[in-house]
Design a protein with these regions (language model features):
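Short, well-structured N-terminal submotif of metal-dependent ribonuclease cores
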Residues: 1-44, 56-68, 132, 143
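Short glycine/serine- and small hydrophobic-enriched flexible loop segments
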Residues: 51-58, 113
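Acidic catalytic patch
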Residues: 43-46, 66-98
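Short beta-strand scaffold positions
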Residues: 9, 41, 102, 119-120
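Phosphate- and divalent-cation-binding pockets in alpha/beta enzyme and binding domains
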Residues: 26, 48, 90, 127-128
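Acidic, PIN/NYN-like endoribonuclease modules and their adjacent C-terminal/linker elements
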Residues: 1-6, 108-145
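Alpha-helix capping/helix-boundary segments
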Residues: 14, 45, 86-87, 107, ...
Length: 145
């Protein structure tokens, strides 16, 4: 399946590494696997994580020390950023075809282009991935919710 050894990491799984109320066994297993298995993210991932973390900071869900810790932990795992392909029209069409947001369509399209399994907790994204033949990384009951 894979053009690269490894998997594509969705932000929904990464959140489980930073927020206890988002955590489950699937998130922990995926995060731990990054010690031995390369993790890839689409170019939008860091911006998406920045948006999530800045909203958490503004809402008082995390403090600045926790924010710094999140960024340090992300840097330490050495995620490899995959470049964008396509344009806004491409992402809009993919989103429409798959019934996803343009962001999630970016994840799925990147997984297809790179032939990578996808690590996600997002049921809608996981269902769309399965429909187009993309396996869910470390497939488990929790990754199917």
């Amino acid at each position: 399946m894979s053009a690269h050894a490894g998997f594509l990491l969705d932000s929904s799984v990464a959140l489980g590494a930073f927020f206890e109320d988002e955590q489950n066994d699937y998130c922990v297993s995926v995060w731990r696997s990054l010690v031995d298995v390369p993790g890839f993210v689409p170019a939008l991932w860091h911006l998406e994580m920045g948006n999530i973390l800045s909203r958490a900071l503004r809402a008082g869900r995390i403090g600045t020390d926790a924010l710094d810790d999140c960024w340090a932990r992300m840097a330490a795992i050495g995620l490899q950023v995959l470049p964008f392909h396509g344009d806004a029209r491409h992402w809009t069409q993919r989103a429409s075809d798959w019934g996803l947001s343009a962001y999630d369509a970016c994840y799925l399209d990147t997984a297809l282009q790179q032939r990578l399994p996808l690590a996600t907790k997002d049921k809608q994204l996981a269902d769309a991935a399965r429909r187009v033949g993309i396996p869910i990384y470390l497939n488990s009951a929790e990754s199917r919710r």
